[in-house]
Amino acid sequence: MADFWLSNKQALDIPLIGRQAFKVFFCFAFAYFISYSFRSVNAVLSPELVNDLEISSGELGLLSSSYLIGFGLAQIPVGILLDKYGPRITEISLMIFAVVGALLFYSADNFALLFAGRMLIGVGVSSCLMSALSGFRSWYPIDKQPQLTSAMLIFGTSGALFASAPVRIILPYIGWRGVFLSLAMICAASIVILYFFLPVKTPKEKPTIWISNSNKVKLLSWESYRPILTNPNYLRLLPVGAISLGGFIALQTLWLGPWLINVMHYTSEKSSQLIFWFNAVLLITYLINTFFLPRLQLIGVSTFSFLSWMTGISLVAQGAAFFLHGPLNIFWWGLYAITSASFVLAQSLVITSFPISHSGRVSTTYNVSIFIGASLMQWGIGYFIDKGIEWGLAVPEAFTLSMGLYLIIQALGFTWLILAPKFLPQFYDSENVKSKL
């Protein structure tokens, strides 16, 4: 059994095609489905959690952020583990923490245990997408990377759909504790699937990181991460991950529900239905992108150009959603879902800027920025809602104030995305950089 765990008896034909390619993709996709379910479920459970725990908006944001904190803290170790041991051992080992965290959350009777349980869940699912991206970079053609990334998000968004209306339907029967017990059981099933069906990384020479003078350095050192953190493409795409995608995660997984209830005055049931349709639009957009992106490339439209346009349009959609509270408000949220589906493409652009041997560290380093941003946005939105109320604003106006501040931050990040070569031309004058973006 140990030999099966650590060695690779069956050689893979690279790149993967056909049945083997689909099988490997499904293993990653099912795990990511569970990850997204854990991430999104608080948007539906928040009224029950608030009632049971009597917590404020800021405290609710902190509880939800505990998932993101655990997720973010695990990213650097995940990158090292992925490059050293491969996706299979890394993802299985970590998902055990998710099962333990879900069981702790299920049985918790105080805020501290809830916080600890949700943080463990964040640690446990922290490699679900990154393991997939690392595996894709190693086992699939490079021109398929954006398409595979979008396909993964189809399954992730399916998890968000599962965590919205379906959870609302079963909630009266099993309660929020039963929801987490069920997720723990599904997560355990995913571990079994990963164990038996994912390829095993062949043991190789102890991995080292490339730097310009070709010296070998320790994996966990500044010299190991300097080429990543100072890479022009990484820096240019950083705001898309930390601000745009991070903020989207904060809205999708927590604040969209309270917005619909407190600003648009929908019931909890109606809010859950609208969150379901928001995620359905997102899923359909990911599906369209999976087939649409390769065709755009054929006519000369780069992934970076597509990402830039969608990021800009998303600002318009959010501005309308935040400030126009009429009957068309849900339309603007739908447009935001459509445009935000492109944010994840920044990850594939960053990863393909580096050699395959670095894919684990590159993907997780960028993911750290995403989840630091998501944690700050999730907490910050709640903080300024509470502050707005303290300053004498009504609850709907406090929500609008907080969302408006978030929109301004996004606009600054978008400005950097577009004008970075003008701000720092010395970073963007090489053909290597131009060819990537």
Residue spans for each PLM region:
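Conserved MFS/SLC helix-loop-helix module at the cytosolic interface between two early adjacent transmembrane helices
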Residues: 73-112
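Extracytoplasmic gate region of multi-pass secondary transporters
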Residues: 42-43, 232-289, 374-382
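Paired small-residue
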Residues: 97, 101, 112-120, 328-335
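Juxtamembrane intracellular "pre-TM" segments in multi-pass secondary transporters
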Residues: 8-17, 202-238, 436-437
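Helix-to-loop junctions at the C-terminal end of transmembrane segments
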Residues: 76-86, 286-301
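Cytoplasmic helix-loop-helix junction between adjacent transmembrane helices
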Residues: 117-155
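Helix-loop-helix hairpin linking two adjacent transmembrane segments in secondary transporters
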Residues: 151-203
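Extracytoplasmic
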Residues: 23-57, 252-257, 377-378
